[in-house]
Amino acid sequence: MCNFNRFADRAAKHDASVMTEDDLLQSLATNVENPWHPPGGGQAGALSHDVIHGLDITEALGLEPPPVGTIRHVLEGSGPRNLKFFGVDLDGRQLVATDADWKLGDGTPIRLSTKDILLVITARRSIPEVSTSQEGMS
Protein backbone atom coordinates (compact mmCIF):
# COMPACT_ATOMS: atom_id res chain seq x y z
CA MET A 1 0.00 0.00 0.00
CA CYS A 2 1.23 3.49 -0.86
CA ASN A 3 1.73 5.94 1.99
CA PHE A 4 0.67 9.31 0.60
CA ASN A 5 2.51 11.28 3.29
CA ARG A 6 5.76 9.51 2.42
CA PHE A 7 5.16 10.10 -1.28
CA ALA A 8 4.39 13.80 -0.73
CA ASP A 9 7.51 14.20 1.42
CA ARG A 10 9.72 12.61 -1.24
CA ALA A 11 8.13 14.66 -4.03
CA ALA A 12 8.57 17.90 -2.06
CA LYS A 13 12.22 17.12 -1.31
CA HIS A 14 12.82 16.31 -4.96
CA ASP A 15 11.18 19.53 -6.14
CA ALA A 16 13.16 21.55 -3.60
CA SER A 17 16.40 19.97 -4.82
CA VAL A 18 15.81 20.77 -8.51
CA MET A 19 13.88 24.06 -8.36
CA THR A 20 14.93 27.50 -7.20
CA GLU A 21 13.03 29.29 -4.44
CA ASP A 22 11.50 31.57 -7.07
CA ASP A 23 10.42 28.55 -9.14
CA LEU A 24 8.78 26.96 -6.08
CA LEU A 25 6.91 30.16 -5.25
CA GLN A 26 5.84 30.58 -8.88
CA SER A 27 4.58 26.99 -8.90
CA LEU A 28 2.39 27.75 -5.89
CA ALA A 29 1.19 31.06 -7.35
CA THR A 30 0.16 29.51 -10.66
CA ASN A 31 -2.06 27.05 -8.81
CA VAL A 32 -4.03 29.67 -6.88
CA GLU A 33 -6.96 29.57 -9.32
CA ASN A 34 -6.93 25.78 -9.75
CA PRO A 35 -10.45 24.41 -9.12
CA TRP A 36 -9.16 21.18 -7.54
CA HIS A 37 -10.27 20.44 -4.00
CA PRO A 38 -9.52 17.58 -1.63
CA PRO A 39 -12.12 14.80 -1.76
CA GLY A 40 -14.91 15.33 0.77
CA GLY A 41 -13.50 18.56 2.11
CA GLY A 42 -15.37 21.13 0.07
CA GLN A 43 -14.14 24.70 0.13
CA ALA A 44 -13.06 24.50 3.77
CA GLY A 45 -10.97 21.42 2.96
CA ALA A 46 -9.38 23.16 -0.01
CA LEU A 47 -8.49 26.17 2.14
CA SER A 48 -7.06 23.92 4.84
CA HIS A 49 -5.01 22.03 2.28
CA ASP A 50 -3.58 25.20 0.75
CA VAL A 51 -2.86 26.87 4.10
CA ILE A 52 -1.20 23.79 5.61
CA HIS A 53 0.95 23.04 2.57
CA GLY A 54 1.57 26.75 2.08
CA LEU A 55 3.04 26.77 5.59
CA ASP A 56 5.32 23.91 4.54
CA ILE A 57 6.73 26.31 1.95
CA THR A 58 6.75 29.58 3.91
CA GLU A 59 8.36 27.94 6.94
CA ALA A 60 11.08 26.32 4.83
CA LEU A 61 11.85 29.61 3.08
CA GLY A 62 11.51 31.83 6.16
CA LEU A 63 8.63 33.81 4.63
CA GLU A 64 5.64 35.39 6.35
CA PRO A 65 2.78 32.97 7.11
CA PRO A 66 -0.80 33.50 5.97
CA PRO A 67 -2.86 36.03 7.96
CA VAL A 68 -3.95 34.99 11.45
CA GLY A 69 -7.62 35.09 10.42
CA THR A 70 -7.00 32.61 7.62
CA ILE A 71 -5.14 30.21 9.89
CA ARG A 72 -7.84 30.58 12.56
CA HIS A 73 -10.47 29.62 9.97
CA VAL A 74 -8.51 26.42 9.28
CA LEU A 75 -8.19 25.77 13.02
CA GLU A 76 -11.96 26.14 13.44
CA GLY A 77 -12.36 22.96 11.41
CA SER A 78 -9.76 21.09 13.46
CA GLY A 79 -10.39 18.73 16.32
CA PRO A 80 -9.69 15.27 17.75
CA ARG A 81 -10.16 13.60 14.36
CA ASN A 82 -7.37 15.74 12.87
CA LEU A 83 -5.08 15.01 15.80
CA LYS A 84 -5.66 11.29 15.29
CA PHE A 85 -5.06 11.54 11.53
CA PHE A 86 -1.70 13.25 12.07
CA GLY A 87 -0.77 11.08 15.07
CA VAL A 88 -0.67 13.98 17.53
CA ASP A 89 -1.40 13.39 21.23
CA LEU A 90 -1.87 16.53 23.31
CA ASP A 91 -1.35 14.39 26.43
CA GLY A 92 -3.27 16.51 28.95
CA ARG A 93 -2.37 19.83 27.33
CA GLN A 94 -4.55 22.53 25.86
CA LEU A 95 -3.29 24.59 22.93
CA VAL A 96 -4.34 28.23 23.40
CA ALA A 97 -3.83 30.80 20.64
CA THR A 98 -2.01 33.97 21.66
CA ASP A 99 -3.13 35.91 18.58
CA ALA A 100 -6.78 34.79 18.26
CA ASP A 101 -9.65 33.50 20.38
CA TRP A 102 -9.11 29.77 19.85
CA LYS A 103 -8.11 26.69 21.87
CA LEU A 104 -8.02 22.91 21.53
CA GLY A 105 -7.73 20.17 24.12
CA ASP A 106 -8.01 19.93 27.87
CA GLY A 107 -5.35 20.27 30.51
CA THR A 108 -2.32 22.46 31.03
CA PRO A 109 -2.54 25.49 28.72
CA ILE A 110 0.26 25.87 26.19
CA ARG A 111 0.16 29.35 24.65
CA LEU A 112 1.25 29.50 21.00
CA SER A 113 0.53 31.53 17.89
CA THR A 114 -2.18 30.19 15.59
CA LYS A 115 0.55 29.36 13.07
CA ASP A 116 2.46 27.28 15.61
CA ILE A 117 -0.71 25.53 16.75
CA LEU A 118 -1.46 24.54 13.16
CA LEU A 119 2.11 23.29 12.73
CA VAL A 120 1.72 21.19 15.91
CA ILE A 121 -1.68 19.66 15.13
CA THR A 122 -0.54 18.72 11.62
CA ALA A 123 2.64 17.12 13.01
CA ARG A 124 4.96 19.55 11.24
CA ARG A 125 6.46 20.59 14.58
CA SER A 126 6.32 19.30 18.14
CA ILE A 127 5.15 21.35 21.11
CA PRO A 128 8.74 21.58 22.47
CA GLU A 129 9.99 22.83 19.07
CA VAL A 130 7.45 25.65 18.81
CA SER A 131 7.60 26.46 22.54
CA THR A 132 11.36 26.95 22.24
CA SER A 133 10.94 29.20 19.20
CA GLN A 134 8.31 31.26 21.09
CA GLU A 135 10.68 31.68 24.05
CA GLY A 136 13.38 32.94 21.70
CA MET A 137 11.00 35.68 20.55
CA SER A 138 10.49 37.07 24.08
Q: Would you name each region that the model predicts?
A:
Residues M1-R6, A16, D22-S138:
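Structured surface interface patches that mediate subunit assembly and partner/cofactor docking
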Residues D9-K13:
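Active-site flanking loop/helix segments enriched in acidic
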